């Protein structure tokens, strides 16, 4: 289920959004295709997400009209997966709290977006900062040029959907996270040119 709350001023220069959602999965599964009588198990996965976002539109900030976005988000995931026939279990609880910001300056010819997100994941030491930058330039009405950069990460955690793929193929799988794993980092760069006729 989910809930959302939206509030804005009459001119829409200030907007506030708050949201919360949850999902509860309780599943009994058999993976053996009548080949392995021990290939059965249970999964319980409770996922919660909640956040708030505030947006303010400036008629001019420094050099151009802009829109500032500030927000905070919290995610919780509690996973218990048991392969009863093999006497194995994976239990994991994840807490991720994050704050993000971005400001986008925009007019008919240019847009510049600068932003970032700071996350604290309970399975990772320290906070993780993920920046983003996007530039758009329209030298004419028929040409659109864009360039962007975004950083990201993936924490070392077991994912419910990954656990059962190999089991369906007849393999016995036991997932255990190694000590001292660090987050994976990603860097995405893109450039594009569009010509409209």
Cite the ranges covered by each PLM segment:
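Outer-membrane beta-barrel signature, preferentially recognizing the C-terminal barrel domain
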Residues: 1-9, 138, 144, 148-197
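Face-selective signature of the C-terminal outer-membrane beta-barrel domain
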Residues: 2-125
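Secondary-structure transition/capping motifs at alpha-helix termini
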Residues: 106-108, 137-142
């Amino acid at each position: 289920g989910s809930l959302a709350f939206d509030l804005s001023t009459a001119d829409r220069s200030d907007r506030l959004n708050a949201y919360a959602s949850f999902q509860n999965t309780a599943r009994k599964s058999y993976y053996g295709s009548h080949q392995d009588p021990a290939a059965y198990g249970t999964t319980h996965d409770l996922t919660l997400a909640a956040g708030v976002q505030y947006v303010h539109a400036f008629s001019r900030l420094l050099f151009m009209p802009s829109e500032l976005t500030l927000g905070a988000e919290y995610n919780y995931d509690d996973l218990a997966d048991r392969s009863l026939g093999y006497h194995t279990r994976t239990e994991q609880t994840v807490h991720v709290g994050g704050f993000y910001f971005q400001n986008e300056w925009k007019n008919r010819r240019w847009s510049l977006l600068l932003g970032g997100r700071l996350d604290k994941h309970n399975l990772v030491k320290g906070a993780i900062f993920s920046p983003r930058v996007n530039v758009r330039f329209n030298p004419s009405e028929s040409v659109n040029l864009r360039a962007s950069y975004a950083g990201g990460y993936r924490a070392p955690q077991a994912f419910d959907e990954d656990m059962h793929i190999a089991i369906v193929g007849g393999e016995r799988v036991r997932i255990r996270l190694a000590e001292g794993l660090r987050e994976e980092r990603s860097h995405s760069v893109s450039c594009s040119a569009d010509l409209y006729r």
